[in-house]
Regions:
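Asp-box/BNR beta-propeller blade signature and adjacent active/binding-site loops
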Residues: 1-264
Length: 264
């Protein structure tokens, strides 16, 4: 959104020629689109926890470049990794979710399965957990007309086909992406921003692999407007969850990055 400035240090993307070691102890990867309706998308990776990055590299899936990437991946082994993304619909608008896999360290990516039928509105920004070798659960930001909510889909065949589950969140206001993690005790923790009054950061817990969800737990509700959210959560060794997001409150006009540390 907006006008992109000219960067003197801009690097043009190239094809990845050296396989990525997905199991490097300090590995991180980010996937980013250049246009949110038509792509293409780029891949960057790091072997020092994000201090320095290699890339950009072109991201192509089964010959398609209309990938609308946001970062959502699950490492399987040294050379195999699954990504959960969206691509352009038939009308060249965002977006239809899918999953893909590489088996050669990111040199090539192949489509595994589409996540649901093509929507009239959009299904974007998946956040996914692996429940077993063949079972995955993904949560997806959805929009149809004036309705904004969150869907959940479950696969029991390693991403080839997906079954729709009851929606974890029925109303997100103006919409916001999910962050889904699997806790150490096996429960699932879903965090998200709500762009409706009271503007807030919230969480839900599932004890049955996403079939049902707890009531909403409000982490904070002092937002000054709807420009909040885009949550990421991680569980610490002590069991507490660190939930990060951008936020605006009534104390100052600028948006800022914040975190809430809480015990699920």
């Amino acid at each position: 959104h907006g006008v992109e400035p000219q960067y003197d240090h801009r690097v043009e993307p190239v094809a990845l020629e050296e396989p990525i070691n997905f199991t490097h102890p300090d590995f991180a990867m980010t996937l980013r689109f250049l246009n949110y309706n038509t792509g293409p998308s780029l891949l960057y990776y790091s072997y020092d926890r994000g201090h320095t990055w290699k890339g950009p590299f072109n991201l192509e899936v089964s010959g398609k470049t209309n990938i609308l990437a946001r970062t959502d991946y699950i490492v399987l082994d040294e050379k195999r990794c699954m990504i959960f993304q969206s691509m352009s619909k038939e009308d060249n608008h965002e977006g239809r979710p899918f999953c893909a896999i590489t088996e050669d360290g990111g040199l090539t990516w192949e489509m595994v399965g589409m996540i649901g039928p093509e929507p009239e509105g959009f299904g974007i920004m998946p956040s996914t957990v692996k429940l077993s070798d063949s079972e995955y659960l993904t949560t997806i930001r959805r929009r149809e007309g004036d309705r904004r909510w969150m869907d959940a889909w479950r696969s029991t065949d390693a991403g080839k086909s997906w079954k729709l589950l009851p929606p974890p969140v029925e109303d997100l206001g103006e919409g916001n992406p999910p962050s889904l993690i699997k806790l150490k005790d096996g429960r699932l923790c879903l965090t998200y921003g709500v762009r409706a009054e009271p503007y807030r950061i919230a969480a839900k817990i599932s004890e049955d692999k996403g079939k049902t969800w707890s009531g909403e737990m409000v982490l904070r509700d002092d937002g000054a407007g709807r420009d909040i959210g885009y949550v990421r959560s991680v569980q610490r060794p002590d069991g507490k969850v660190v939930t990060m997001y951008y936020f605006e409150d009534k104390l100052k006009p600028e948006r800022y990055i914040a975190a809430t540390i809480w015990l699920p």
